[in-house]
Amino acid sequence: MKNSINASEVVNIIKEKVETFDNPIKRENIGEVISVTDGITLVYGLEKAKFGEKVSFASGVEGIVLDLDHDTAGIVVLGNDRDVKEGDVVKCSGDVVQVPVGHELLGRVVNALGDPIDDGGEIRAKNKMYIESKAPGIIDRKSVHEPLQTGIKIIDLLIPIGRGQRELIIGDRQIGKTTIAIDTIINQKKINDEVNENQKIYCVYVAIGQKISTVAKVVNKLKESGALEYTTVVVASASDCAPMQFLAPYTGCTIGEFFRDNGMHCLVVYDDLSKHAVAYRQMSLLLRRPPGREAYPGDIFYVHSRLLERAAKMSDEKGQGSLTALPIIETQAGDVSAYVPTNVISITDGQIFLESELFHKGFRPAVNIGLSVSRVGSAAQLKSVKKVAGSIKLSLAQYRELEDFAKFGSDLDATVQLSLNKGKYLIELLKQKQYSPMQIEEQVLLMYIFSNLYGQLNKVQVSNINRFECDLINYFQTVHPGVLKKLSGDMNDDIKDDILGIVSDFVTQFNCV
């Protein structure tokens, strides 16, 4: 007869199995896609989703929660929305977007999520940071006092920029806004070669909504000039979806913050925030948020202010690092009173205004000195620059005024004629070719000659000023490099006497050629 198992034995076996069961239930916050429209998905469920949380769809595509309702969530898709279908399961990650940061990203081209899109292989960064972080507080900051040299004469002399400043570059399309930013990045090459690690300026160039061919030209130019080795390029091109264009500047800022928070210096260029605002407007309207002025949502100011406020010069206790921001805004027919331009002007510490009329006249970079200002940069100017630049702005303003006045009358007194003649020389001296930044001591030399040795400069014809400028700087670099080097410090009488003698001899030789 077979042995029978009684009920108590069965109960004991079940109890033992239950107690030794080591596969705990995994709880997941999931939802279901209700609708997909132009990169925006409406998801039912996700009860514990957080604003800004990263989610993943069944196809592997990721998204970000940007709208929360009673029982639904609005999610922007970070990729192709064709891979997302109604009824798909959506899972919350429990985390917000992070991007890789560190020296490993230098020389690389990445997308808005920090993934490489060049041919350099995988980025093995040791650190990651959240793309959304609080701006440094008042106590953690220090006033701007160190110069950031752009290599552009009209900016370094008249609209100086300091490390930790936010300086807006604004103007119509195709008049040199990006060129100023790229020149500034290229100019750091010589400076970085001469200083230690903590004094180097690392750069981040963020391309938002631009053609891929345009970005490729910029990357090639940086590579040719040797500037890509200390630069990271973040790209969200015109072919990328609106959410990627929206995230790109925050990613670029986060990459720059790594250097700032570790006692180093970084320059971030946002090219441009007009397209960034358009991408955010598109997302907001699709999320059915109420439109405001020019159909932008009510929080468009906050979107830009929370980005630009992260640029700062840190205090001694926080490592003395800095993050400098050069946002770019494109205007329509020179209208700076539009919604987004006025917002960004009010957020930043000054603006460099480029004018189409000056550009077409051949005055390049086409900076309108009357409308351009740097509110904190003067505190960071070198003493020698302050001495020579003091009268330049006044001379330029007088020339512009007298130029219009001279059109109405032919009889001009000697003083007016002298101011007009000096203005013509100054205009030629302030012109600069694309991708040819100039060191600060060379700028000081040229402006000192204009301000104090006009009698010598006047011997050169206006049409020959550009050739005179190039030959003079080459002469100083090869024959008198010591004198040129001293001009980056304070200027004393001995240096002035040396310059007078050298320039007098050079002008004589130049006119004989």
Swiss-Prot record:
Keywords tagged on the record: ATP synthesis, ATP-binding, Cell membrane, CF(1), Hydrogen ion transport, Ion transport, Membrane, Nucleotide-binding, Translocase, Transport
Question: What SUPFAM superfamilies does UniProt report for this protein, alphabetically?
Answer: C-terminal domain of alpha and beta subunits of F1 ATP synthase, N-terminal domain of alpha and beta subunits of F1 ATP synthase, P-loop containing nucleoside triphosphate hydrolases
Q: What does this protein do?
A: Produces ATP from ADP in the presence of a proton gradient across the membrane. The alpha chain is a regulatory subunit.
What's the name of the protein?
ATP synthase subunit alpha
Native species of this protein? Answer: Wolbachia pipientis subsp. Culex pipiens (strain wPip)
Reaction(s) catalysed by this chain's protein: ATP + H2O + 4 H(+)(in) = ADP + phosphate + 5 H(+)(out)
Family stated for the protein in its record: Belongs to the ATPase alpha/beta chains family.
Q: How does it associate, per the subunit comment?
A: F-type ATPases have 2 components, CF(1) - the catalytic core - and CF(0) - the membrane proton channel. CF(1) has five subunits: alpha(3), beta(3), gamma(1), delta(1), epsilon(1). CF(0) has three main subunits: a(1), b(2) and c(9-12). The alpha and beta chains form an alternating ring which encloses part of the gamma chain. CF(1) is attached to CF(0) by a central stalk formed by the gamma and epsilon chains, while a peripheral stalk is formed by the delta and b chains.
Residues with site note (Required for activity): S372
Single annotated GO MF: ADP binding
